[in-house]
Swiss-Prot record:
Extracellular topological domain: 28-480
Residue ranges of the motif Cell attachment site: 152-154
Function: ICAM proteins are ligands for the leukocyte adhesion protein LFA-1 (integrin alpha-L/beta-2). During leukocyte trans-endothelial migration, ICAM1 engagement promotes the assembly of endothelial apical cups through ARHGEF26/SGEF and RHOG activation.
Organism: Pan paniscus (Pygmy chimpanzee)
Molecular function GO labels: integrin binding
Upper lineage: Eukaryota, Metazoa, Chordata, Craniata, Vertebrata
Protein name according to UniProt: Intercellular adhesion molecule 1
Complexes and interactors: Homodimer. Interacts with MUC1 and promotes cell aggregation in epithelial cells. Interacts with ARHGEF26/SGEF. Interacts (on T cell side) with CD81, CD247 and CD9 at immunological synapses between antigen-presenting cells and T cells.
Domain Ig-like C2-type: from-to ranges: 41-103, 128-193, 230-297, 325-378, 412-464
Membrane-related topology note: Single-pass type I membrane protein
Disulfide bond entries: 48-92, 52-96, 135-186, 237-290, 332-371, 403-419, 419-457, 431-457
Length: 532
Protein backbone atom coordinates (compact mmCIF):
# COMPACT_ATOMS: atom_id res chain seq x y z
CA UNK A 1 0.00 0.00 0.00
CA UNK A 2 1.31 3.34 -0.95
CA UNK A 3 2.40 5.56 1.94
CA UNK A 4 0.02 8.28 2.89
CA UNK A 5 2.46 10.53 4.71
CA UNK A 6 2.73 13.16 1.93
CA UNK A 7 -0.98 13.94 2.09
CA UNK A 8 -0.94 16.24 5.18
CA UNK A 9 1.59 18.47 3.50
CA UNK A 10 -0.59 18.93 0.42
CA UNK A 11 -3.00 21.52 1.90
CA UNK A 12 -0.16 23.63 3.20
CA UNK A 13 1.55 23.44 -0.16
CA UNK A 14 -1.63 24.43 -1.95
CA UNK A 15 -2.12 27.32 0.42
CA UNK A 16 1.40 28.51 -0.23
CA UNK A 17 1.03 28.17 -3.99
CA UNK A 18 -2.33 29.87 -3.89
CA UNK A 19 -0.85 32.75 -1.99
CA UNK A 20 2.15 33.06 -4.30
CA UNK A 21 0.44 32.29 -7.61
CA UNK A 22 -3.25 33.04 -7.40
CA UNK A 23 -5.24 31.36 -10.10
CA UNK A 24 -6.75 33.24 -12.96
CA UNK A 25 -10.25 32.12 -12.08
CA UNK A 26 -12.90 33.84 -10.05
CA UNK A 27 -12.97 31.36 -7.15
CA UNK A 28 -12.89 33.14 -3.77
CA UNK A 29 -12.27 31.84 -0.25
CA UNK A 30 -13.94 33.56 2.69
CA UNK A 31 -13.81 33.15 6.48
CA UNK A 32 -16.31 33.95 9.19
CA UNK A 33 -15.97 35.70 11.52
CA UNK A 34 -13.12 37.76 10.14
CA UNK A 35 -12.21 39.10 13.64
CA UNK A 36 -12.70 37.51 17.02
CA UNK A 37 -11.75 38.63 20.56
CA UNK A 38 -11.87 35.87 23.13
CA UNK A 39 -10.49 35.09 26.58
CA UNK A 40 -7.20 33.33 26.83
CA UNK A 41 -7.63 29.57 26.60
CA UNK A 42 -11.04 29.95 25.00
CA UNK A 43 -12.53 28.32 21.88
CA UNK A 44 -14.00 29.72 18.69
CA UNK A 45 -15.85 28.31 15.68
CA UNK A 46 -14.54 29.41 12.31
CA UNK A 47 -16.39 28.82 9.03
CA UNK A 48 -14.34 28.48 5.84
CA UNK A 49 -16.21 28.70 2.51
CA UNK A 50 -15.45 29.00 -1.20
CA UNK A 51 -17.33 30.38 -4.14
CA UNK A 52 -16.95 27.25 -6.30
CA UNK A 53 -19.37 24.42 -5.88
CA UNK A 54 -16.99 21.51 -6.05
CA UNK A 55 -13.59 22.51 -4.60
CA UNK A 56 -10.84 20.01 -4.74
CA UNK A 57 -9.63 21.14 -1.32
CA UNK A 58 -11.18 23.27 1.43
CA UNK A 59 -9.61 23.66 4.88
CA UNK A 60 -7.95 25.83 7.50
CA UNK A 61 -4.30 26.25 8.38
CA UNK A 62 -3.51 27.04 12.08
CA UNK A 63 -1.18 25.83 14.84
CA UNK A 64 -4.15 25.77 17.21
CA UNK A 65 -5.93 22.58 18.13
CA UNK A 66 -8.82 22.23 15.66
CA UNK A 67 -11.73 19.97 15.13
CA UNK A 68 -13.94 19.84 12.03
CA UNK A 69 -17.55 19.80 13.01
CA UNK A 70 -20.00 17.54 11.23
CA UNK A 71 -21.84 20.53 9.98
CA UNK A 72 -20.91 21.73 6.56
CA UNK A 73 -21.60 21.41 2.85
CA UNK A 74 -19.75 20.96 -0.45
CA UNK A 75 -18.24 24.42 -0.40
CA UNK A 76 -18.02 25.29 3.33
CA UNK A 77 -16.73 23.77 6.56
CA UNK A 78 -16.94 24.65 10.24
CA UNK A 79 -13.92 24.23 12.53
CA UNK A 80 -13.67 24.58 16.28
CA UNK A 81 -10.38 26.09 17.38
CA UNK A 82 -9.62 25.51 21.09
CA UNK A 83 -7.15 26.54 23.80
CA UNK A 84 -6.36 29.84 22.17
CA UNK A 85 -3.51 31.22 24.34
CA UNK A 86 -2.32 34.11 22.22
CA UNK A 87 -3.22 36.22 19.23
CA UNK A 88 -3.42 34.13 16.07
CA UNK A 89 -4.34 34.41 12.34
CA UNK A 90 -5.84 31.11 11.14
CA UNK A 91 -6.11 30.97 7.33
CA UNK A 92 -8.83 29.30 5.29
CA UNK A 93 -7.78 27.96 1.87
CA UNK A 94 -9.57 26.40 -1.13
CA UNK A 95 -8.53 24.84 -4.45
CA UNK A 96 -11.14 25.13 -7.15
CA UNK A 97 -10.97 24.23 -10.83
CA UNK A 98 -10.55 27.84 -11.73
CA UNK A 99 -7.81 28.53 -9.14
CA UNK A 100 -6.69 28.67 -5.47
CA UNK A 101 -7.46 31.32 -2.85
CA UNK A 102 -7.07 32.03 0.92
CA UNK A 103 -8.66 34.14 3.64
CA UNK A 104 -7.52 34.97 7.22
CA UNK A 105 -9.41 35.45 10.45
CA UNK A 106 -7.79 37.50 13.25
CA UNK A 107 -8.06 36.07 16.75
CA UNK A 108 -7.31 38.51 19.57
CA UNK A 109 -6.85 37.00 23.02
CA UNK A 110 -7.62 39.06 26.16
CA UNK A 111 -6.70 38.39 29.79
CA UNK A 112 -6.37 40.43 32.90
CA UNK A 113 -2.94 40.93 34.54
CA UNK A 114 -1.56 38.12 36.64
CA UNK A 115 0.04 40.49 39.13
CA UNK A 116 -0.92 44.03 40.12
CA UNK A 117 1.24 45.15 43.02
CA UNK A 118 1.93 48.47 44.72
CA UNK A 119 5.41 48.67 46.16
CA UNK A 120 5.39 48.73 49.99
CA UNK A 121 5.17 52.18 51.61
CA UNK A 122 7.48 53.38 54.36
CA UNK A 123 6.15 52.47 57.79
CA UNK A 124 6.16 56.21 58.59
CA UNK A 125 6.52 59.19 56.29
CA UNK A 126 7.33 62.74 57.48
CA UNK A 127 4.83 65.43 56.57
CA UNK A 128 6.22 67.76 53.90
CA UNK A 129 8.40 65.11 52.26
CA UNK A 130 7.88 63.52 48.83
CA UNK A 131 6.52 59.99 48.69
CA UNK A 132 7.12 57.87 45.57
CA UNK A 133 4.39 55.41 44.62
CA UNK A 134 5.41 52.53 42.32
CA UNK A 135 3.06 50.00 40.73
CA UNK A 136 4.14 46.92 38.77
CA UNK A 137 1.86 45.00 36.42
CA UNK A 138 2.68 41.60 34.98
CA UNK A 139 0.66 40.14 32.10
CA UNK A 140 -2.59 41.36 30.69
CA UNK A 141 -3.67 41.72 27.05
CA UNK A 142 -4.38 43.34 24.76
CA UNK A 143 -1.95 45.95 26.03
CA UNK A 144 -3.48 48.62 23.83
CA UNK A 145 -6.58 48.42 26.01
CA UNK A 146 -4.77 48.11 29.35
CA UNK A 147 -4.33 51.15 31.63
CA UNK A 148 -2.64 51.47 35.04
CA UNK A 149 -4.12 53.86 37.65
CA UNK A 150 -2.53 54.95 40.95
CA UNK A 151 -5.05 55.86 43.68
CA UNK A 152 -5.28 57.48 47.12
CA UNK A 153 -8.55 56.14 48.40
CA UNK A 154 -10.78 56.64 45.35
CA UNK A 155 -8.91 59.68 44.09
CA UNK A 156 -6.84 59.15 40.95
CA UNK A 157 -3.27 60.31 41.26
CA UNK A 158 -1.95 59.13 37.89
CA UNK A 159 -3.16 57.14 34.86
CA UNK A 160 -0.85 55.62 32.22
CA UNK A 161 -1.00 52.89 29.56
CA UNK A 162 0.64 49.62 30.51
CA UNK A 163 3.93 49.52 28.63
CA UNK A 164 6.64 46.91 28.92
CA UNK A 165 6.77 43.66 30.76
CA UNK A 166 6.38 44.08 33.58
CA UNK A 167 4.73 47.45 33.18
CA UNK A 168 5.72 50.00 35.83
CA UNK A 169 4.00 53.27 36.68
CA UNK A 170 5.32 55.73 39.28
CA UNK A 171 4.24 59.06 40.72
CA UNK A 172 5.36 61.39 43.52
CA UNK A 173 3.08 62.74 46.26
CA UNK A 174 3.86 65.58 48.69
CA UNK A 175 2.78 64.15 52.03
CA UNK A 176 0.32 66.15 54.14
CA UNK A 177 -1.22 65.65 57.57
CA UNK A 178 -4.51 64.69 55.95
CA UNK A 179 -2.78 61.73 54.33
CA UNK A 180 -2.34 60.03 57.70
CA UNK A 181 -4.22 56.75 57.61
CA UNK A 182 -5.01 57.07 53.88
CA UNK A 183 -5.02 53.93 51.71
CA UNK A 184 -2.95 53.90 48.52
CA UNK A 185 -3.49 51.29 45.81
CA UNK A 186 -2.91 50.44 42.16
CA UNK A 187 -5.62 49.43 39.70
CA UNK A 188 -5.55 48.08 36.15
CA UNK A 189 -8.36 48.68 33.68
CA UNK A 190 -8.76 46.42 30.65
CA UNK A 191 -11.35 48.29 28.60
CA UNK A 192 -13.01 46.02 26.03
CA UNK A 193 -16.23 47.96 25.82
CA UNK A 194 -15.46 49.12 22.25
CA UNK A 195 -15.33 45.42 21.32
CA UNK A 196 -18.72 44.82 22.85
CA UNK A 197 -17.39 43.37 26.08
CA UNK A 198 -16.92 45.03 29.50
CA UNK A 199 -14.37 46.89 31.59
CA UNK A 200 -12.21 44.47 33.56
CA UNK A 201 -10.55 45.86 36.70
CA UNK A 202 -7.86 44.40 38.93
CA UNK A 203 -6.81 46.21 42.12
CA UNK A 204 -3.74 45.65 44.25
CA UNK A 205 -3.83 45.18 47.99
CA UNK A 206 -4.05 48.63 49.63
CA UNK A 207 -1.22 50.08 51.70
CA UNK A 208 -2.03 52.46 54.55
CA UNK A 209 0.22 55.48 54.98
CA UNK A 210 1.20 56.78 58.40
CA UNK A 211 2.44 60.35 58.45
CA UNK A 212 4.01 62.22 61.34
CA UNK A 213 5.45 65.53 62.48
CA UNK A 214 8.31 65.51 64.99
CA UNK A 215 9.80 68.96 65.64
CA UNK A 216 13.54 69.41 65.48
CA UNK A 217 13.61 70.90 68.98
CA UNK A 218 14.47 68.44 71.76
CA UNK A 219 11.96 67.71 74.53
CA UNK A 220 11.97 69.92 77.61
CA UNK A 221 13.18 68.10 80.71
CA UNK A 222 12.57 69.47 84.20
CA UNK A 223 14.12 67.63 87.13
CA UNK A 224 16.04 68.25 90.35
CA UNK A 225 19.75 68.73 89.72
CA UNK A 226 20.59 67.03 93.01
CA UNK A 227 18.75 64.26 94.82
CA UNK A 228 19.39 62.81 98.26
CA UNK A 229 19.73 59.10 98.86
CA UNK A 230 16.51 57.39 100.03
CA UNK A 231 14.32 60.26 98.80
CA UNK A 232 12.02 60.77 95.84
CA UNK A 233 12.07 63.38 93.11
CA UNK A 234 9.74 64.33 90.29
CA UNK A 235 10.75 64.39 86.63
CA UNK A 236 8.66 66.09 83.92
CA UNK A 237 9.31 65.75 80.18
CA UNK A 238 7.23 67.65 77.60
CA UNK A 239 7.22 68.51 73.89
CA UNK A 240 4.94 70.55 71.62
CA UNK A 241 4.19 70.36 67.89
CA UNK A 242 3.69 66.58 67.55
CA UNK A 243 1.45 64.76 65.09
CA UNK A 244 -0.19 62.38 65.71
CA UNK A 245 0.53 63.02 69.35
CA UNK A 246 -1.11 59.81 70.60
CA UNK A 247 1.41 57.75 68.61
CA UNK A 248 4.38 59.35 70.36
CA UNK A 249 6.36 57.07 72.67
CA UNK A 250 8.07 58.56 75.71
CA UNK A 251 11.01 56.92 77.46
CA UNK A 252 12.35 58.25 80.78
CA UNK A 253 15.37 56.72 82.47
CA UNK A 254 17.79 57.60 85.25
CA UNK A 255 20.96 55.67 84.61
CA UNK A 256 19.84 52.05 84.19
CA UNK A 257 16.57 52.70 86.02
CA UNK A 258 13.59 52.85 83.66
CA UNK A 259 10.91 55.24 84.93
CA UNK A 260 7.17 54.76 84.51
CA UNK A 261 5.70 58.13 83.61
CA UNK A 262 2.08 59.23 83.59
CA UNK A 263 1.52 60.88 80.20
CA UNK A 264 -1.01 63.66 79.63
CA UNK A 265 -1.83 64.55 76.01
CA UNK A 266 -2.90 67.86 74.48
CA UNK A 267 -3.89 68.63 70.89
CA UNK A 268 -0.32 68.41 69.65
CA UNK A 269 1.66 68.12 72.88
CA UNK A 270 2.30 65.81 75.79
CA UNK A 271 3.63 65.99 79.32
CA UNK A 272 5.14 62.93 80.98
CA UNK A 273 5.53 62.98 84.77
CA UNK A 274 7.37 60.34 86.77
CA UNK A 275 8.64 59.82 90.30
CA UNK A 276 12.20 58.68 90.80
CA UNK A 277 13.58 57.02 93.92
CA UNK A 278 17.30 56.72 94.59
CA UNK A 279 19.33 54.56 96.96
CA UNK A 280 22.90 54.48 98.17
CA UNK A 281 23.81 52.35 95.14
CA UNK A 282 22.92 55.28 92.88
CA UNK A 283 25.19 57.76 94.66
CA UNK A 284 27.25 59.86 92.27
CA UNK A 285 26.50 61.52 88.94
CA UNK A 286 23.72 59.82 86.96
CA UNK A 287 22.44 60.49 83.45
CA UNK A 288 18.77 61.41 83.15
CA UNK A 289 17.32 60.84 79.69
CA UNK A 290 14.01 61.72 78.06
CA UNK A 291 13.53 60.26 74.57
CA UNK A 292 10.52 60.84 72.32
CA UNK A 293 9.99 58.41 69.45
CA UNK A 294 7.50 59.12 66.69
CA UNK A 295 7.51 57.42 63.33
CA UNK A 296 11.03 56.45 62.43
CA UNK A 297 12.63 59.42 64.19
CA UNK A 298 13.46 60.31 67.77
CA UNK A 299 14.45 63.32 69.85
CA UNK A 300 16.13 63.14 73.22
CA UNK A 301 17.35 65.37 76.02
CA UNK A 302 20.06 64.44 78.50
CA UNK A 303 20.75 65.92 81.92
CA UNK A 304 22.92 64.97 84.85
CA UNK A 305 21.56 64.40 88.34
CA UNK A 306 23.90 64.20 91.31
CA UNK A 307 22.84 61.65 93.91
CA UNK A 308 24.28 62.47 97.33
CA UNK A 309 24.21 61.19 100.90
CA UNK A 310 24.07 63.83 103.64
CA UNK A 311 22.87 62.67 107.07
CA UNK A 312 21.79 65.30 109.56
CA UNK A 313 24.60 66.50 111.86
CA UNK A 314 25.03 64.78 115.19
CA UNK A 315 24.80 66.85 118.40
CA UNK A 316 26.48 65.11 121.35
CA UNK A 317 26.12 66.23 124.97
CA UNK A 318 28.39 64.89 127.71
CA UNK A 319 25.16 64.03 129.49
CA UNK A 320 21.68 65.16 128.52
CA UNK A 321 20.90 65.78 132.22
CA UNK A 322 23.41 67.24 134.68
CA UNK A 323 23.41 68.94 138.07
CA UNK A 324 23.98 72.65 138.49
CA UNK A 325 27.68 73.52 138.31
CA UNK A 326 28.64 70.52 136.18
CA UNK A 327 30.93 71.12 133.21
CA UNK A 328 29.25 70.12 129.95
CA UNK A 329 30.84 69.49 126.55
CA UNK A 330 28.63 69.99 123.49
CA UNK A 331 29.94 68.52 120.23
CA UNK A 332 28.60 68.87 116.69
CA UNK A 333 29.79 66.50 113.95
CA UNK A 334 28.66 66.28 110.32
CA UNK A 335 29.59 64.98 106.85
CA UNK A 336 33.38 65.14 106.22
CA UNK A 337 32.89 67.74 103.48
CA UNK A 338 30.33 69.80 105.40
CA UNK A 339 30.80 73.07 107.25
CA UNK A 340 29.14 73.27 110.66
CA UNK A 341 28.08 75.95 113.12
CA UNK A 342 26.94 75.43 116.70
CA UNK A 343 24.38 77.94 117.98
CA UNK A 344 25.41 80.25 115.17
CA UNK A 345 29.13 80.00 115.96
CA UNK A 346 31.13 78.49 113.06
CA UNK A 347 33.81 75.91 113.59
CA UNK A 348 37.35 77.27 113.85
CA UNK A 349 38.97 76.32 111.62
CA UNK A 350 36.07 75.80 109.22
CA UNK A 351 35.30 72.11 109.08
CA UNK A 352 32.87 69.31 109.92
CA UNK A 353 33.34 69.45 113.74
CA UNK A 354 32.82 72.04 116.47
CA UNK A 355 32.46 71.86 120.27
CA UNK A 356 31.43 74.10 123.15
CA UNK A 357 32.36 73.95 126.87
CA UNK A 358 30.13 75.39 129.61
CA UNK A 359 29.34 75.13 133.32
CA UNK A 360 25.69 74.26 133.80
CA UNK A 361 23.55 76.89 135.51
CA UNK A 362 19.81 76.94 136.23
CA UNK A 363 19.43 79.29 133.27
CA UNK A 364 20.78 76.50 131.03
CA UNK A 365 17.89 74.19 131.92
CA UNK A 366 15.92 73.55 128.71
CA UNK A 367 18.58 75.25 126.62
CA UNK A 368 18.67 74.05 123.02
CA UNK A 369 21.93 73.51 121.19
CA UNK A 370 21.42 73.73 117.44
CA UNK A 371 23.98 72.39 115.00
CA UNK A 372 23.72 73.51 111.37
CA UNK A 373 25.68 71.74 108.61
CA UNK A 374 26.11 72.98 105.04
CA UNK A 375 27.26 70.78 102.15
CA UNK A 376 27.90 71.91 98.59
CA UNK A 377 26.57 69.45 96.00
CA UNK A 378 26.86 70.21 92.29
CA UNK A 379 27.00 73.92 92.98
CA UNK A 380 24.03 73.89 95.35
CA UNK A 381 24.21 74.43 99.11
CA UNK A 382 22.36 71.81 101.13
CA UNK A 383 21.52 72.58 104.76
CA UNK A 384 20.80 70.14 107.59
CA UNK A 385 20.05 70.92 111.25
CA UNK A 386 19.94 68.95 114.48
CA UNK A 387 18.95 70.15 117.95
CA UNK A 388 19.51 68.71 121.43
CA UNK A 389 18.19 70.03 124.76
CA UNK A 390 20.14 70.16 128.04
CA UNK A 391 18.38 69.53 131.33
CA UNK A 392 20.01 71.04 134.45
CA UNK A 393 19.02 69.82 137.91
CA UNK A 394 19.01 72.57 140.57
CA UNK A 395 17.48 73.15 143.98
CA UNK A 396 14.18 74.86 144.80
CA UNK A 397 13.84 78.63 144.63
CA UNK A 398 11.31 80.98 146.23
CA UNK A 399 11.75 84.63 145.36
CA UNK A 400 9.71 87.81 145.74
CA UNK A 401 8.61 87.77 142.14
CA UNK A 402 7.01 84.34 142.25
CA UNK A 403 6.08 84.29 145.92
CA UNK A 404 5.40 87.78 147.41
CA UNK A 405 6.19 88.05 151.13
CA UNK A 406 3.27 90.30 152.13
CA UNK A 407 -0.41 90.39 151.19
CA UNK A 408 -3.00 92.89 152.48
CA UNK A 409 -6.57 92.08 151.59
CA UNK A 410 -9.94 93.51 152.65
CA UNK A 411 -12.05 91.18 154.71
CA UNK A 412 -14.76 89.30 152.78
CA UNK A 413 -13.05 89.97 149.42
CA UNK A 414 -12.27 87.21 146.92
CA UNK A 415 -8.53 86.64 146.55
CA UNK A 416 -6.20 84.00 145.11
CA UNK A 417 -2.94 83.49 147.01
CA UNK A 418 -0.09 82.93 144.53
CA UNK A 419 3.22 81.36 145.46
CA UNK A 420 5.22 79.35 142.98
CA UNK A 421 8.49 77.60 143.55
CA UNK A 422 11.00 77.01 140.77
CA UNK A 423 13.57 74.26 140.41
CA UNK A 424 14.35 71.08 138.49
CA UNK A 425 12.79 68.76 139.28
CA UNK A 426 9.78 70.89 140.17
CA UNK A 427 9.66 71.07 143.97
CA UNK A 428 6.69 70.31 146.19
CA UNK A 429 5.36 73.48 147.90
CA UNK A 430 3.48 73.78 151.20
CA UNK A 431 2.62 77.00 153.12
CA UNK A 432 1.52 76.46 156.76
CA UNK A 433 0.57 78.80 159.63
CA UNK A 434 1.60 77.54 163.02
CA UNK A 435 2.62 74.32 161.31
CA UNK A 436 -0.94 73.22 160.72
CA UNK A 437 -3.15 75.77 158.98
CA UNK A 438 -2.48 75.66 155.20
CA UNK A 439 -2.53 78.64 152.87
CA UNK A 440 -4.77 77.73 149.89
CA UNK A 441 -2.17 78.60 147.24
CA UNK A 442 -3.64 78.98 143.77
CA UNK A 443 -7.24 78.75 144.99
CA UNK A 444 -9.84 81.50 145.03
CA UNK A 445 -10.95 82.09 148.64
CA UNK A 446 -13.10 84.52 150.63
CA UNK A 447 -10.83 86.49 152.93
CA UNK A 448 -11.68 86.03 156.61
CA UNK A 449 -9.96 86.91 159.86
CA UNK A 450 -8.78 83.29 160.11
CA UNK A 451 -6.64 83.75 157.00
CA UNK A 452 -4.57 86.46 158.64
CA UNK A 453 -1.14 85.55 159.93
CA UNK A 454 2.38 84.51 158.97
CA UNK A 455 2.90 81.38 156.92
CA UNK A 456 6.05 79.39 156.39
CA UNK A 457 6.30 78.26 152.77
CA UNK A 458 8.58 75.27 152.23
CA UNK A 459 9.68 74.09 148.73
CA UNK A 460 11.29 70.63 148.66
CA UNK A 461 12.79 68.41 145.91
CA UNK A 462 15.54 65.84 145.48
CA UNK A 463 17.93 68.75 145.01
CA UNK A 464 17.18 70.27 148.43
CA UNK A 465 14.68 72.56 150.11
CA UNK A 466 14.11 76.27 150.74
CA UNK A 467 11.71 78.23 152.99
CA UNK A 468 10.12 81.64 152.90
CA UNK A 469 7.77 83.53 155.25
CA UNK A 470 4.60 85.00 153.84
CA UNK A 471 2.36 87.41 155.80
CA UNK A 472 -1.33 87.87 155.14
CA UNK A 473 -3.01 91.05 156.48
CA UNK A 474 -6.79 91.29 156.65
CA UNK A 475 -8.48 94.72 156.78
CA UNK A 476 -11.76 94.74 158.73
CA UNK A 477 -14.61 97.21 157.85
CA UNK A 478 -13.99 99.51 160.98
CA UNK A 479 -10.49 100.13 159.85
CA UNK A 480 -11.85 101.02 156.52
CA UNK A 481 -14.10 103.78 158.06
CA UNK A 482 -11.16 105.24 159.95
CA UNK A 483 -9.07 105.20 156.84
CA UNK A 484 -11.84 106.87 154.85
CA UNK A 485 -12.26 109.59 157.55
CA UNK A 486 -8.55 110.23 157.69
CA UNK A 487 -8.32 110.39 153.96
CA UNK A 488 -11.32 112.78 153.75
CA UNK A 489 -9.85 115.05 156.43
CA UNK A 490 -6.56 115.05 154.66
CA UNK A 491 -8.25 116.02 151.42
CA UNK A 492 -10.17 118.89 153.14
CA UNK A 493 -7.09 120.20 154.88
CA UNK A 494 -5.13 119.98 151.72
CA UNK A 495 -7.75 121.90 149.80
CA UNK A 496 -7.93 124.67 152.49
CA UNK A 497 -4.18 124.99 152.57
CA UNK A 498 -4.01 125.29 148.82
CA UNK A 499 -6.71 127.99 148.83
CA UNK A 500 -4.88 130.01 151.53
CA UNK A 501 -1.66 129.76 149.61
CA UNK A 502 -3.23 130.97 146.40
CA UNK A 503 -4.97 133.91 148.21
CA UNK A 504 -1.75 135.12 149.88
CA UNK A 505 0.15 134.82 146.64
CA UNK A 506 -2.33 136.98 144.76
CA UNK A 507 -2.28 139.58 147.57
CA UNK A 508 1.51 139.81 147.46
CA UNK A 509 1.44 140.23 143.70
CA UNK A 510 -1.01 143.15 143.95
CA UNK A 511 1.05 144.82 146.67
CA UNK A 512 4.20 144.52 144.59
CA UNK A 513 2.57 146.04 141.55
CA UNK A 514 1.27 148.96 143.67
CA UNK A 515 4.73 149.67 144.99
CA UNK A 516 6.16 149.66 141.51
CA UNK A 517 3.47 152.09 140.37
CA UNK A 518 4.17 154.52 143.24
CA UNK A 519 7.86 154.63 142.39
CA UNK A 520 7.20 155.61 138.84
CA UNK A 521 4.36 158.29 139.37
CA UNK A 522 4.22 161.17 142.04
CA UNK A 523 1.27 161.13 144.30
CA UNK A 524 -1.40 163.81 143.76
CA UNK A 525 -3.54 165.20 146.63
CA UNK A 526 -7.15 164.29 146.50
CA UNK A 527 -9.28 167.49 146.00
CA UNK A 528 -12.80 167.44 147.14
CA UNK A 529 -15.17 168.74 144.54
CA UNK A 530 -17.04 171.98 145.26
CA UNK A 531 -20.71 171.41 145.36
CA UNK A 532 -22.69 173.47 142.95
Amino acid sequence: MAPSSPRPALPALLVLLGALFPGPGNAQTSVSPPKVILPRGGSVQVTCSTSCDQPDLLGIETPLPKKELLLGGNNWKVYELSNVQEDSQPMCYSNCPDGQSTAKTFLTVYWTPERVELAPLPSWQPVGKDLTLRCQVEGGAPRANLTVVLLRGEKELKREPAVGEPAEVTTTVLVERDHHGANFSCRTELDLRPQGLQLFENTSAPHQLQTFVLPATPPQLVSPRVLEVDTQGTVVCSLDGLFPVLEAQVHLALGDQRLNPTVTYGNDSFSAKASVSVTAEDEGTQRLMCAVILGNQSRETLQTVTIYSFPAPNVILTKPEVSEGTEVTVKCEAHPRAKVTLNGVPAQPVGPRVQLLLKATPEDNGRSFSCSATLEVAGQLIHKNQTRELRVLYGPRLDERDCPGNWTWPENSQQTPMCQASGNPLPELKCLKDGTFPLPVGESVTVTRDLEGTYLCRARSTQGEVTRKVTVNVLSPRYEIVIITVVAAAVIMGTAGLSTYLYNRQRKIRKYRLQQAQKGTPMKPNTQATPP
